[in-house]
Amino acid sequence: MKTKFIFVTGGVVSSIGKGLAAASLGALLEARGLRVTHQKLDPYINVDPGTMSPFQHGEVFVTDDGAETDLDLGHYERYTSARLSKKSNFTTGQVYFSVIEKERRGDYLGGTVQVIPHITDEIKSKILDNAKGSDIAIIEIGGTVGDIESLPFLEAIRQFKADRGAGNVLYLHVTLVPFIKTADELKTKPTQHSVKELREIGIQPDILLCRCEQDLPREMKAKIALFCNVEEKAVITSMDAEHIYAVPLALHKEGLDEQVVEKLNIWAKAPDLTPWQQVVDKLMHPGHGKVRIAIVGKYVNLTESYKSLAEALTHGGIANDCRVHLSYLDSEKIEQEGIDGLLDGVDGILVPGGFGERGTEGKIKAIEYARTRKIPFFGICLGMQMAVVEYARNVCHLDDAFSSEFKQDCANPIIHLMEEQKGVSRKGGTMRLGAYPCTLAKGSFAQKAYGTLDISERHRHRYEFNNDYRDLLVSNGLILSGIYKEGDLVEIVEIPDHPWFVGCQFHPEFKSKPLNPHPLFRAFIAAALHNIKA
């Protein structure tokens, strides 16, 4: 089958839900037996989000091949069976970088390099390259229609219909139909203006996905269809759902996937959405009550920084048929106020990854609290490193143990800079990134969770466990249960005489899905649930 292209744009406001809409559509089309791939086009000039502040950009999602990408790729992977790559996310910065490199090589034979055709051709080339081998390529354009940064991307996708043929390209526009409380009615004017702006660029949307608080009445759909030049049945209501994993079911009920296959002339079987219905049923009606998990971090004022983490914990709840209630605790608050009372009543404690010294002592106090009070604990990346520091200080009595990331001259650098990172001065794209294999210790918490001895997980770090302290820590009871054998790197640590205490250097949250929860999150939530019963 010749690849079909679906371009997802957004209007009126940012954060309107394009990513979830694209991911949900991917889930619906995959349920129809189609091979789906996703791609996100970001208009900012940064080469990638790897060096951007979590407070500005939210989470950085890492792919198997080591790309630091937009958090929407996390949605795409969670909702489908896809394993995305560096090709699945590109930015204005990457496009211009590539075009300038070609110009310096002489690829343009002395021609004047312009936005049209050179920049737009580069954008189209990257879209086509990513789409190879798929039936459907869903491409989300970041930003909002009308943003000056988005114009080259919109021009490129406008050209796509002429390049590939009308029956092979579909434009889906996500827009807002606000409810005005004082007037007690929904207003279509923002949608009309958004579509008008899109049409001025030369793009006529085929489907409108209308985000609204209330169901759109038939007469309002007819009005939108008339003024926006789309079929009435192509005006799709997208109301706020009880849970984001209910969105595919809601959009299917509205007929979104039916409209897509009809307009793209695709023969596809009816979707089997039973697995999604089961997920939603477990979320809405859990059989084993609720567990309370505290996330102790430094970016808690912007929970988007921990997007995949929060979702993976929810997946652990799905696997254990229980509801997971998350509370976010700023580790600096622990430093300022002490830990007394801040973690009362929690059933599990998780310390996530992060960068910089701020808040680290608060994390160490939270880890000590979990260790000494036998509360299930999960440390990820920096969380694992601080767990080792806490153990060295309070069990091995190395009072000055720390990470050389935060104190270069510390006497006992339990965590130190990786050998291959020494001499690296550039920040962007230079960490240990992507998937690496790991061998597990038989009988460990990790091995029991995975059910195998050999695993592969995604990394994003520069610092690691210092092997000079292996013997000391092991002789004092710490288990090194996961090793990257090629580099002899410690990837997982555990405390065996504890209900469940695991720290891992990698980011397991990036591989968890609602239909296939990650083994470590499944085991962590199971331990928290058992902690309640105990």
UniProtKB/Swiss-Prot annotation:
Residue positions binding L-glutamine: 354, 382-385, 405, 462
Any one of the GO CC terms: cytosol
Protein encoded by which gene: pyrG
Reactions that this protein is recorded to catalyse: UTP + L-glutamine + ATP + H2O = CTP + L-glutamate + ADP + phosphate + 2 H(+); L-glutamine + H2O = L-glutamate + NH4(+); UTP + NH4(+) + ATP = CTP + ADP + phosphate + 2 H(+)
InterPro entries: Class_I_gatase-like, CTP_synthase, CTP_synthase_N, GATASE, GATase1_CTP_Synthase, P-loop_NTPase
Pathway: Pyrimidine metabolism; CTP biosynthesis via de novo pathway; CTP from UDP: step 2/2
Amidoligase domain as annotated region, ranges: 1-266
Annotated residues for binding of ATP: 15-20, 72
Keywords associated with the record: ATP-binding, Glutamine amidotransferase, Ligase, Magnesium, Metal-binding, Nucleotide-binding, Pyrimidine biosynthesis
Enzyme active site: 381 (nucleophile), 507, 509
Protein name as it appears in the record: CTP synthase
The protein's Enzyme Commission number: 6.3.4.2
Entry-linked PROSITE patterns: GATASE_TYPE_1
Molecular function GO labels: ATP binding; CTP synthase activity; glutaminase activity; identical protein binding; metal ion binding
Entries under Gene3D superfamilies matching the protein: 3.40.50.880, P-loop containing nucleotide triphosphate hydrolases
Residues given in the record as CTP binding sites: 14, 147-149, 187-192, 223
Superkingdom: Bacteria
Enzyme class label: ligase
Family annotation (SUPFAM superfamilies): Class I glutamine amidotransferase-like (SSF52317), P-loop containing nucleoside triphosphate hydrolases (SSF52540)
Native source organism of the sequence: Geotalea uraniireducens (strain Rf4)
Protein task: Catalyzes the ATP-dependent amination of UTP to CTP with either L-glutamine or ammonia as the source of nitrogen. Regulates intracellular CTP levels through interactions with the four ribonucleotide triphosphates.
PANTHER family with a match to the protein in the record: CTP SYNTHASE (PTHR11550), CTP SYNTHASE-RELATED (PTHR11550:SF0)
Known regulation of activity: Allosterically activated by GTP, when glutamine is the substrate; GTP has no effect on the reaction when ammonia is the substrate. The allosteric effector GTP functions by stabilizing the protein conformation that binds the tetrahedral intermediate(s) formed during glutamine hydrolysis. Inhibited by the product CTP, via allosteric rather than competitive inhibition.
